[in-house]
Design a protein with these regions (language model features):
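Single-residue signature of alpha-solenoid repeat helices
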Residues: 9, 42, 76, 108, ...
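Catalytic core of non-heme Fe(II) oxygenases with the double-stranded beta-helix
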Residues: 436-450, 454-554, 559-586
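Non-heme Fe(II)/2-oxoglutarate
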Residues: 373-472, 494
Length: 586
């Protein structure tokens, strides 16, 4: 493991770990599994340590970090909170960082601020950096800039602070400032990790698509990590460039490995290119064998081929890695009790995961289980509003929505749908629309959405929910809009059914609607409750809603939602958004 050969190290641990009792050996094996991405194996070993009474801070921290990495924030937070009380600045800093990553910004800010004020301690400047990030997440941007601007203890920390300020500039729409800072950082010998893709994002979000494409063409393979390749692939797809998967395929040819395999195979399967996916599976098996990564891709390909019985016959190397596909297969075969069991296992593995909650809801509906009502009652959880709009224009509401439409037009720079999103044959604005704008109509729109949303969130519904209800259990301490984007549609555009995995509550606001859409037919309607996968007995929608200019719709992020295509003249422009934990982009 010290030499970096994690595959060999894991293989050695696999041969002996079942009978190992030494706490240090178990901890080292857990570390190795964690670094190799075998998170469930790492957690199993840490559970063995806990059962032995070995709950020392490093083991607790590793367990919390793994929970955080798989979005099991509900399990990670109590561990980070316990670690924050240990009188050890390094452990406390790690706990503060974990609290931040789990979205408890207030607790992270309090702890980071206390650590930053410890003069002469080596951790104080790192804590000040985290404090600045917490302030930015709390939308206290001036304080964040002031805090980050004072950090100069070492060149590395100063670069890190400059990088975070640049990300804050990008997040708040100060594109020129972000670009200038990032270019300066990239001229240094060792720029901060992520600076290059952040510059690419800055170019894309500011509409400089030609410059972004040139940046991709001029990049060298040596500096291309997977994060960079993902950003490039998305942009190449949305700008209709030839062979948008070329960079991922080239990386696989030159440096094959599990991570690039999963990324490329996932893209091929999403594009329904099963021939290339099968070829990739064969190549991977020759080098790495039919391991858990191969099995995940193989089972996903079987799902695309509707080979559901064959899926259930597969030997599962990593149960949780493929459980989602198994769950889908049970639905398709009408084995709803088994689908419910699989969904429950997934929810236990990642409490709060909106997709897994949606699987659970779907199973309850297929079984006609009365427990579904607590999760699907549209009369309670769905809200529609048509609020009075701000008087920005003399023409009233009509001119307000037209001004919003015109402001959004300046943010549209793509020519095709994002390949990993739900929209088909439409385009989507890049970035976070309502934080990256200085346009008065969009600022007014955000204020309007916040007013409608928080009036609903502060109502009696959420106070009366049972404690285990996901809308109560996973409600953030402080709810804020953390993502927003606009989608421009035309005749034929529609959305695949999906959930918003990073939200708590989601919504849409209709800015432009074709005159042909009405209640007499479902064309162009928003559809709630239809799953995106096959069920032996088709489920009816929970609700279908006709778009109308100025209408705002809110629904739980775990609710499947899609749109029907429409025909005829006229476009449809919507602003979609998620409420949940604070945005931690900075």
């Amino acid at each position: 493991m010290e030499k970096g050969d994690l595959i060999a190290a894991c293989s050695l641990f696999d041969q002996s770990i079942a009978t190992e009792t030494d706490p240090n050996a178990l901890f080292q094996a857990a570390l190795c599994y964690r670094k190799s991405g075998r998170l469930n194996d790492a957690l199993s070993l840490l559970k063995r340590l806990e059962d032995q009474g070995q709950t020392n801070p490093p083991a607790l921290l590793l367990r919390a970090d793994i929970f955080c990495a798989v979005d099991r924030h509900h399990h990670a937070l109590p561990l980070y909170q316990a670690l924050s009380g240990i009188d050890n600045p390094q452990i406390q800093y790690s706990a503060a960082l974990g609290l931040f990553q789990c979205g408890d910004i207030d607790a992270a800010l309090k702890l980071a601020s206390a650590l930053a004020e410890r003069a002469t301690h080596p951790i104080n400047d790192q804590a000040a950096l985290l404090k600045g990030r917490c302030l930015a997440a709390a939308q206290r941007y001036d304080e964040a800039r002031q805090t980050l601007g004072k950090i100069d203890a070492t060149p590395a920390l100063q670069k890190a602070a400059t990088y975070r300020i640049a990300r804050m500039d990008l997040h708040t729409g100060q594109f020129s400032a972000a670009e200038a800072s990032l270019r300066n950082l990239l001229d240094l010998d060792e720029p901060p990790r992520g600076a290059r893709e952040t510059l690419l994002q800055s170019l894309v979000h500011s509409g400089q698509t030609d410059a972004a494409l040139n940046m991709i063409r001029e990049a060298t393979d040596a500096s291309a990590d997977l994060s960079w390749l993902r950003h490039c692939t998305e942009l190449l797809s949305e700008l209709d460039q030839p062979d948008p998967l070329q960079l991922l395929a080239s990386r696989w040819d030159k440096a094959p490995g599990p991570e690039i395999f999963r990324e490329l195979c996932n893209r091929l399967l999403e594009a329904n290119d099963l021939t290339r996916a099968e070829s990739l599976l064969k190549d991977y098996a020759k080098t790495f064998g039919q391991d858990a990564h191969w099995q995940w891709a193989h089972m996903r390909k079987l799902e695309k081929e509707r080979a559901y019985e064959e899926i259930l016959q597969c030997k599962q190397v990593d149960p949780f890695g493929s459980m989602e596909v198994v769950c889908h297969a049970h639905f398709a075969l009408g084995r709803y009790a088994e689908a419910l069991e699989a969904a429950q296992q997934l929810c236990r593995s990642a409490p709060g995961d909106q997709y897994f909650i949606a699987l659970l809801v779907t199973a309850l509906r297929c079984l006609d289980d009365p427990r579904q009502a607590a999760l699907t009652d549209s009369a309670l959880f769905l809200t529609e509003a048509e609020p009075q709009v701000p008087a920005l224009e003399a023409g009233g509401a009509t001119d307000f929505w037209r001004s919003v439409e015109d402001a959004i037009a300046h943010h549209h720079s793509m020519t095709s749908a994002p390949p990993t999103q739900s929209v088909v044959d439409g385009i989507q604005t890049p970035g976070n629309l309502l934080t990256q704008t200085a346009a008065p109509p969009l600022i007014a729109l955000k204020a309007l959405l916040d007013e409608v949303a928080h009036r609903f969130f502060d109502g009696t519904l959420f106070k009366d929910l049972a404690e285990p209800h996901p809308l109560r259990l996973f409600r953030p301490n402080s709810v804020s809009m953390h993502a927003s984007w606009a989608i421009q549609a035309k005749a034929g555009t529609y959305h695949h059914s999906h959930v918003h995995s990073k939200g708590w509550y989601s919504g849409t606001c209709y800015v432009e609607v074709p005159e042909s859409l009405n209640d007499s037919a479902e064309a162009g309607h928003l559809v709630l409750g239809e799953p995106p996968f096959e069920t032996k007995d088709p489920l009816p929608p929970l609700a279908t809603l006709c778009p109308k200019v100025g209408k705002i719709v809110l629904f739980p992020s775990y609710c499947w939602h899609s749109t029907r295509p429409y025909s005829g003249q006229g476009g449809r422009q919507v602003v979609a958004f998620d409420y949940g934990k604070a945005n931690r982009f900075v």
